[in-house]
Design a protein with these regions (language model features):
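Helix-turn-helix repeat elements of alpha-solenoid scaffolds
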Residues: 60-72, 108-113
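Short, charge-rich amphipathic alpha-helical segments embedded
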Residues: 69-100
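Hydrophobic/aromatic side-chain positions at a characteristic register within alpha-helices
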Residues: 59-60, 97-104
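Extended amphipathic alpha-helical interaction segments
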Residues: 113-195
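Generic helix N-cap/helix-start motif at coil->alpha-helix transitions
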Residues: 44-52
Length: 225
């Protein structure tokens, strides 16, 4: 084909490509900025438990990409975020987790707070629940720190911190969500104890998943309108 004949075809290809790119950009912008609300009360506790178990494994195995993908799936399927928003929000969650993981003391851990604030600010703006973003972000970080420094805390401190986080998000009395906190803390304790003893087996992960399933089921019942 001569250059004269190719020129119109190349122009057509360029125009089609530009149109496709424009449509993709419009779709992304619509996804990001079109106002919509989602319910944080409507989730499948079994699926949340399955994904949280997977995320814990990815975190401790230092699998950043896998953790990001699991967080995206959780936000998209259980908290009803759109594909683009779920990726943006998951980035902040995963980044906060690994910033915290590298920390050695409270001043290091607090470097994760800006990403946690961005994470919860997105959820606040998308959810049908009005909560204090800064307070919730601080409570999230606080249970991370209590868990990391658990040898310096009483046995019930972690369960209480986990319950206080959900109480602040859902605007319910902390006593109503203590069972959630207790079961989730128990799952964490099993993971920590088994890791210190040489390794977490598949049977251990199954037990952890069961505790998390019961924990999230308890929360789902506690926060229903």
């Amino acid at each position: 084909m001569s250059s004269e004949r190719r020129r119109p075809l190349l122009k057509l290809i360029a125009r089609v490509t530009a149109l496709v790119l424009a449509l993709v950009i419009c779709a992304v912008l619509f996804d990001l900025f079109y106002p919509r609300k989602t319910s944080l009360r409507e989730f499948d506790s079994d699926e949340v438990a399955r994904l949280e178990t997977a995320m814990w494994r990815s975190y401790y195995e230092k699998q950043r990409v896998r953790l990001f993908n699991e967080a995206t799936e959780l936000l998209r399927t259980q908290y009803h975020l759109t594909p683009v928003k779920s990726n943006v929000v998951a980035y902040y969650a995963a980044n906060a987790a690994f910033v915290f993981k590298e920390g050695k003391q409270r001043s290091d851990y607090e470097k994760a707070l800006p990403d946690l604030i961005k994470f919860y600010n997105y959820l606040h703006n998308l959810s049908d629940i009005d909560f204090d973003v800064y307070k919730v972000s601080k409570l999230e970080l606080e249970w991370w720190i209590i868990h990391r420094e658990r040898e310096n805390h009483a046995p019930g401190d972690l369960a209480r911190a986990l319950a206080e986080l959900q109480a602040a998000i859902y605007n319910v009395p902390v006593e109503r969500v203590m069972e959630h906190g207790r079961l989730r803390a128990e799952a964490m304790t099993i993971r920590d104890t088994k890791a210190e003893q040489g390794g977490v087996t598949e049977a251990d992960w199954a037990k952890i998943n069961d505790l998390l399933r019961r924990s999230w089921s308890s929360l789902a019942q506690a926060v229903k309108n």
